[in-house]
Amino acid sequence: MKTAVLLVCLAYVMAAILSLCASAPSWRPQGRFGKRTIPDRLPQTEESSLPDFGFSHLPALPLELFYNPRDLVHSGFRPRLCSVSGVEGYPPCVESHSDRKMKNLLDDLFGL
């Protein structure tokens, strides 16, 4: 009698394990991930008709993209943007003496 009860219990345990393993997962994603907007919903402007090369269409870039605002407040650091290639509307970047010295060392090292 003991073996019969043991076999029945074992059969129930095996049935429970197999039913859990063989069933489909209960979690299903809700909605579509990465939904795209319908082009007709957005107004067609000159900017949106241009190809998107990953550049910002904003006239100014937010400071928060580059710096943590909390760190800026505590350090007192106020970044100034400048242009190395001479972009109009930005002051030219001025190299410091140590920057020129480092550039010369790197040029000598790499033979540039």
From Swiss-Prot:
GO cellular component: extracellular region
Superkingdom in the source lineage: Eukaryota
Signal peptide segment: 1-23
Gene Ontology annotations of biological process type: neuropeptide signaling pathway
Predominant location category: secreted
Record bears the keyword Zinc: no
Locations listed in the record: Secreted
Organs and tissues of expression: Neurons L2-4 and L6, also called giant dorsal LUQ (Left Upper Quadrant) neurons of the abdominal ganglion. Also expressed in smaller neurons in the CNS and in peripheral organs such as the kidney.
Keywords: Amidation, Cleavage on pair of basic residues, Neuropeptide, Secreted, Signal
UniProt PTM: The prohormone is proteolytically cleaved in 2 steps, yielding first 2 products: luqin and PRMP. In the second step, PRMP is cleaved to yield luqin-B and luqin-C.
Keyword Ribonucleoprotein: no
Record's protein name: Abdominal ganglion neuropeptides L5-67
Species, as recorded: Aplysia californica (California sea hare)
